[in-house]
């Protein structure tokens, strides 16, 4: 389902420029963020896909409204023995042969039912909530850890950088999907104890933490490289001369200069995290049934693809659209903040 994530990122930082007469010139009166926003507004494709993503988020947020006031069911309720009126006829939600009803395009079972008699539309919307929530939360965890580790490794260098870099090398030696499955299955079986906090194996926090951890090297290393180049800049030397300590220099002087890079990586990380969550759930190492996720809904539909193809096709299409929208919008943000920047993904 999912390909390996980025194994090589290149980020080149360029000053904000405007084009005049075929030459790149500084945009007078505009800061880099305002200039970036202006560039982004001109990128109609990126804006369109950004709107698509917002619509997907809105549909996920509205899942309880659809379930409670339209479909009148829950993502866990089965209707194996129920019937429904369709085209003037009374039909079983699930036939005696175990074949679920297809899309009715009406309030109940709008996209049909699954083999357990559950409403596919309701589960799709709740699955979107879980998949997007895990993707965003995991990207946030990755971003926070990457910022701290990248700053510490790049600023202190020496043995500190060596220890952190070797840990990244170990994680980088495993394909992300393999590392994610190994961690996911292990934590599902035994849960996770964080001091007084006990996280159950079937909690949504488990795949969130797993995905958040496995992507750290792919963001932290580029940040480390930029910190290494910035620590010798004049503004850092000036801060040292004024008596600023390492923490102040890292978080007050260097970190603001990494903001555009962090924003670009974070946007693309959400797409990778959503895709990896679906892959882990499909393989049984992510969100555990009966809790819905696009990945486990697709898994349930694979065995019924000949009799009920909608169960696998619809969530697959939603997953594809979400990842495409995030990637296109992320590319637009990258181009807007720095037209010469490269965030390259090599497999």
Describe each model-derived feature in a short phrase.
Residues 60, 171-172, 213-214, 252-253, ...:
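Hydrophobic alpha-helical transmembrane segments of integral membrane proteins
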Residues 113-118, 155-156, 238-255, 298:
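Short helix-to-coil transition segments within interhelical loops
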């Amino acid at each position: 389902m999912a390909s390996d994530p980025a194994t090589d990122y290149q980020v080149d930082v360029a000053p904000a420029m405007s084009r005049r007469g075929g030459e790149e010139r500084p945009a007078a009166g505009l800061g880099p963020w305002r200039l970036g926003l202006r560039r982004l507004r001109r990128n109609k494709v990126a804006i369109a896909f950004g709107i698509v993503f917002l619509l997907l988020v809105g549909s996920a947020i509205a899942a309880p409204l659809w379930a409670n006031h339209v479909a009148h069911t829950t993502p866990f309720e089965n209707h194996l023995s129920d019937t429904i009126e369709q085209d003037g006829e009374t039909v079983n939600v699930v036939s005696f042969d175990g074949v679920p009803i297809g899309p009715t395009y009406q309030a109940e079972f709008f996209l049909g039912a699954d083999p357990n008699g559950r409403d596919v539309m309701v589960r799709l919307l709740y699955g979107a909530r879980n998949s997007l929530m895990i993707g965003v939360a995991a990207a946030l965890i990755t971003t926070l850890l990457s910022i701290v580790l990248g700053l510490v490794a790049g600023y202190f260098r020496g043995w500190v950088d060596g220890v952190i870099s070797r840990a990244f090398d170990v994680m980088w030696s495993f394909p992300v999907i393999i590392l994610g499955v190994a961690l996911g299955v292990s934590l599902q079986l035994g849960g996770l104890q964080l001091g007084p906090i006990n996280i159950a194996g079937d909690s949504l926090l488990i795949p969130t933490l797993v995905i958040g951890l496995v992507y750290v090297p792919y963001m932290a290393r580029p940040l480390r490289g930029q910190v290494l180049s910035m620590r010798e800049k004049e503004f850092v030397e000036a801060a040292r001369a004024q008596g600023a300590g390492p923490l102040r220099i890292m978080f007050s002087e260097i970190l603001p200069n990494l903001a555009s890079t962090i924003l670009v990586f974070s946007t693309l990380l959400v797409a990778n995290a959503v895709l990896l969550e679906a892959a882990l759930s499909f393989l049984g190492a992510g969100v555990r049934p009966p809790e819905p996720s696009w990945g486990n809904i697709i898994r349930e539909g694979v065995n019924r693809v000949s009799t009920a193809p909608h169960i696998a096709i619809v969530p697959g299409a939603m997953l594809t659209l979400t990842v495409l929208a995030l990637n296109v919008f992320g590319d637009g943000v990258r181009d807007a903040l720095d037209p010469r920047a490269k965030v390259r993904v090599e497999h």
